A protein has these predicted regions:
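Residue-level structural signal for beta-strand termini and adjacent loop
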Residues: 27-28, 51, 100
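Unchanged
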Residues: 23, 32-35, 67-152
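Short loop segments at secondary-structure junctions
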Residues: 18-19, 40-42, 51, 114-119, ...
Length: 165
């Protein structure tokens, strides 16, 4: 292990490729996570705008977060909804999942759609400054096309949810 941190670890693997060549792979170990596409009764997607230091800008994203040790993904999804947008869902459905960036990390994200939203907040994480934005479903593709939504997990999650819209 090269580094052990609060939310990630870094390790170096030496592998043998299919062509019998030894190669080094640097791997970021990351807990699995959830991403949720919440849709209200008026056909708006509730997104969060928050500052992302590596990108050095505020990004418009779906609510998302890490799955705690021993926590089931659907429980984590409901917790993140309550923490980030102040709602719970009476209709939470798993859409599938995806590897966030399999070239260097083992992070797997479970993607959910949340409907039938009810106010039910939990305290937000101390280090998060989040603003909730309500976006009509029919504007989502334009926001992606014109670079207003640039976060990969958000684009992937919205794409997975589009058949439901």
């Amino acid at each position: 292990m090269l580094y052990e941190g609060k939310i990630l670890n870094l390790r170096k693997d030496i592998i043998q490729t299919e062509s019998n060549i030894k190669a080094v792979r640097e791997i970021v170990e990351h807990k699995p996570a959830v991403a949720i596409v919440p849709i209200d009764d008026n056909k708006n997607v509730l997104l969060v705008r928050q500052y992302r230091h590596p990108a050095k800008q505020y990004l418009l994203e779906v609510p998302a977060g890490l799955i705690e040790d021993g926590e089931e993904p659907d429980i984590a999804a409901m917790r993140e909804l309550r923490e980030e947008i102040g709602y719970s869902s009476n209709n939470l459905r798993l859409l599938g999942g995806f590897w966030s960036s399999p070239g260097f990390t083992d992070e797997y994200m479970y993607c959910y759609i949340a409907k039938d939203l009810k106010e039910s907040s939990l305290p937000a994480d101390d280090d998060e400054n989040i603003k909730v934005e309500s976006i009509p479903v029919d504007r989502i593709t334009k926001l992606i096309k014109f670079g207003e939504i640039t976060d990969a997990k958000t684009i992937a999650s919205l794409l997975m949810a589009f058949e439901i819209f």
